[in-house]
């Protein structure tokens, strides 16, 4: 069994949660603030990223951070290209901790339009994916947001997610598809029904390929059970 096959098996059957270690430039100051460092602790962006990397390294090297509790970790691109205890970060996570490495690939959300926020364009995606594969990344993560029960907008969100997911699959990586439904959505249950229909249409056309779905807890019990049981869905997280 290859390392990738071992990771596939763990992602399908293992226990634990996926740790988010993917703060980008916009969210890093808040993350460091919660950690106890205010903006006086750095003079420029480079120093800020050095500090947040040290914070992440402290987290992942802690004895409690292991594959017994954690399925995977989502990394920012800088973290993917960095090291933990002198070892490439992705190799450290898997070989030392048995934690599956993922890469955050989206560049944030576009402005809200018709009750949804699509992802901003991802320039150089092909190169990013090639670099991720070279660094032994297992999969990717990308997020959109649905704020209203607008069927057309929800279809657009799902269309964009799966269009990019196909490119990710072609590169040999497993995408986490995340069309988040805002918990404050006035017609959340209705929006989730539209979302279920849109996703089912797409996963039915994946052939033998598999994706991971990251979905908001639905209003209706077991609404997404058909997706969790779908042969083309590795896991719902």
PLM features per residue range, with description:
Residues 1-138, 146-148, 198-202, 207-211, ...:
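Alpha/beta catalytic barrel-like cores
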Residues 133, 140-224:
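Eukaryote-skewed repeat-based solenoidal scaffolds used as protein-protein interaction platforms
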